[in-house]
């Protein structure tokens, strides 16, 4: 599994002060641009892409509807993603599929899409249908992050992930059960076929996130011969 760490600057000064060396153990960097005001995103973008030049980077604009910090219309959301993608070519571009479904045709031209779905309340009963619909669009990655309210929620998502990965071996999946009970899903991603696990450096960006240092130790232990 690849370890992903988010950067969440709230203004240009914070972005300029990021010490990229602190992220050396992360395999991917996720820029959560939703911690900024809409007008600041394109002003801060050069600093982020300069700081992490040569690193794999995910551009994410997480809206309030899916647990983020910014509220945008569908048009504003797509326009901002397109601008950043065209100007800076991040390795991955997150798109909240079910929240902005009417705009998906405008995004399919991008070969580096992460089609995502987030639910901070529950693990929906129709998880198989959700995974199936996202998979049918053949994005670069399918990402699903849902709240686990029981151990069974966690086991169900892990089983669904393993099943979909077995049937679609070329498709990248990233599935996470949020919350304390879901932490095992972050550790066992190699077993289920989930490609990434999100870890925290300073503050967690989702419930149940484990620190980068702990995740690195866990990964090293699991990879021992």
Swiss-Prot record:
| Annotated catalysed reactions | 3-dehydroquinate = 3-dehydroshikimate + H2O
- This entry's Enzyme Commission designation comes to 4.2.1.10
Using the UniProt record, name the top-level EC class of this enzyme in a single word.
lyase
Q: Which UniProt keywords apply?
A: Amino-acid biosynthesis, Aromatic amino acid biosynthesis, Lyase, Schiff base
Database matches in InterPro entries: Aldolase_TIM (IPR013785), DHquinase_I (IPR001381), Type-I_3-dehydroquinase (IPR050146)
Report the function annotation for this chain: Involved in the third step of the chorismate pathway, which leads to the biosynthesis of aromatic amino acids. Catalyzes the cis-dehydration of 3-dehydroquinate (DHQ) and introduces the first double bond of the aromatic ring to yield 3-dehydroshikimate.
Tell me the protein family, please. Belongs to the type-I 3-dehydroquinase family.
- Name-wise, this protein is 3-dehydroquinate dehydratase
Name the source organism: Streptococcus gordonii (strain Challis / ATCC 35105 / BCRC 15272 / CH1 / DL1 / V288)
């Amino acid at each position: 599994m690849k370890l992903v760490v988010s950067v969440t600057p709230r203004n240009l000064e914070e972005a300029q002060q990021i010490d990229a060396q602190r992220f050396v153990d992360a395999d991917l960097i996720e820029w959560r641009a939703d911690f900024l005001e809409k007008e600041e995103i394109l002003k801060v973008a050069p600093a982020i892409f300069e700081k992490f030049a040569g690193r794999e980077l995910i551009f994410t604009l997480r809206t309030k509807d899916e647990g983020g910090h910014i509220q945008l219309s569908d048009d504003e959301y797509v326009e901002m993603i397109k601008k950043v993608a065209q100007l800076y070519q991040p390795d991955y571009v997150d798109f909240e599929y079910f929240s902005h479904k009417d705009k998906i045709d405008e995004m399919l031209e991008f070969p580096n899409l992460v089609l995502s779905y987030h639910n901070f309340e529950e693990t929906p009963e129709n998880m198989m249908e959700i995974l199936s619909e996202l998979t049918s669009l053949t994005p670069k990655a399918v990402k699903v992050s849902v709240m686990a309210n029981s151990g069974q929620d966690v086991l169900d998502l892990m089983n669904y992930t393993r099943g979909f990965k077995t049937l679609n071996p070329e498709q990248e999946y990233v599935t996470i059960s949020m919350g304390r009970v879901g932490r095992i899903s972050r550790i066992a991603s190699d077993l289920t076929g989930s490609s990434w696990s999100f870890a925290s450096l300073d503050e967690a960006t989702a419930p149940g996130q484990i620190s980068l240092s702990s995740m690195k130790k866990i990964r090293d232990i699991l990879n021992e011969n």
